[in-house]
Amino acid sequence: MQRINQNMTGYRMPAYVEEILTENYCKNFVRMSIIKDSGKYSFSYKPAGLSRLDPSSMGLYEKLLLIRNLISMSETASDHLIEAESYLIEPELVYSKGGNVDINSLRLLYYPDIKKLEFRYKIVLFADRILNRNIREEREMAERIRSAAEPRDINRLKMFLDKTILRLESNMN
């Protein structure tokens, strides 16, 4: 697969974030290089062995597992000093090995979020974008995710997702 290139102006990336990303210390992100020139950033991603994930071909179980794993990935990124508010979380930026949604197969394209939207809102918006509003069960799930994320406690949302995923797993067996 070829490289993916993005350019950005009007942003200043902390040097430690640049090092963490370019040295691939945090494995949650697609390998990348960064070139700075006169206030302009050029991001070049090398998604070797990865392809963009297509949530439209997934069932509810896989979509919820994807959301839950993105939360776990954000916690790992935070452990590496890259806060979830600092980068975009959108379906187009999620890459995977073989279309799998397990945490070891997923990677994100790091692209700065200038607005620094609160993480719980990003997850709710992500869920809204991947859950199909034409399917009653998925539409209701989007509402439940929104409700679980409302009290500013990401642990509540994690518990809700964990319970729902376990329930769906038991129904599959």
Indicate residue ranges for each PLM-predicted region:
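A short glycine-rich, hydrophobically flanked beta-strand micro-motif that places a catalytic Asp/Glu
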Residues: 82-98
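Ordered hydrophobic segments in well-structured contexts
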Residues: 42-44, 88, 105-109
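Protein kinase catalytic-loop region centered on the HRD/HxD motif
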Residues: 72-85
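Well-ordered, non-membrane alpha-helical segments in soluble/globular domains
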Residues: 64-71, 122-124
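Gram-positive cell-envelope targeting signals
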Residues: 1-3, 8, 73, 170-173
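Conserved structural core of kinase catalytic domains
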Residues: 1-67
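C-lobe/activation-segment region of protein kinase-like
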Residues: 97-172
